[in-house]
Amino acid sequence: MANSRRVSKVSSLIKREVSLMLMQDIKDDRVGAGMVSITEVEVSGDLQHAKIFVSIYGSEEARAETMEGLRASQGFVRRTLGQRIRLRRSPEVLFIEDRSLEEGDRMIHLINQLEIKDPEELEAQESEEMV
């Protein structure tokens, strides 16, 4: 098993290389259907598996199409990583859609919708209701 420092370094290298592949090397038109960004890469302790979390901006149809294209390109990504990063074995690559940014936006929107009232206004309103 690799130490945590090595795992972290490999994770950041994979993130950088896959980002470059998304911009330059992956030719599948489905991947271009939505704007894709890599939010995180989790590499297993033995460096054999890499979960690549992607955030996709666009409609639901574009997201589904983009994920389809990314899944179809997993073999290409694994081979290319093997050529660009010096590892004994190329890690198995798995793309996972990350909706945490979308959830964060939704939470911020809900918080902004709440009306935060001044305590004095609340007291005045309550006293009016009692009369």
From Swiss-Prot:
InterPro entries: KH_dom-like_a/b (IPR015946), RbfA (IPR000238), RbfA_dom_sf (IPR023799), Ribosome-bd_factorA_CS (IPR020053). The keyword Cytoplasm applies. It is found in: Cytoplasm. GO terms for cellular component: cytosol. Keywords: Cytoplasm, Ribosome biogenesis. GO terms for biological process: maturation of SSU-rRNA. GO terms for molecular function: ribosomal small subunit binding. Coiled coil: none annotated. Monomer. Binds 30S ribosomal subunits, but not 50S ribosomal subunits or 70S ribosomes. Belongs to the RbfA family. One of several proteins that assist in the late maturation steps of the functional core of the 30S ribosomal subunit. Associates with free 30S ribosomal subunits (but not with 30S subunits that are part of 70S ribosomes or polysomes). Required for efficient processing of 16S rRNA. May interact with the 5'-terminal helix region of 16S rRNA. This is Ribosome-binding factor A. The lineage of its organism: Bacteria, Bacillati, Cyanobacteriota, Cyanophyceae, Oscillatoriophycideae. The gene is rbfA.
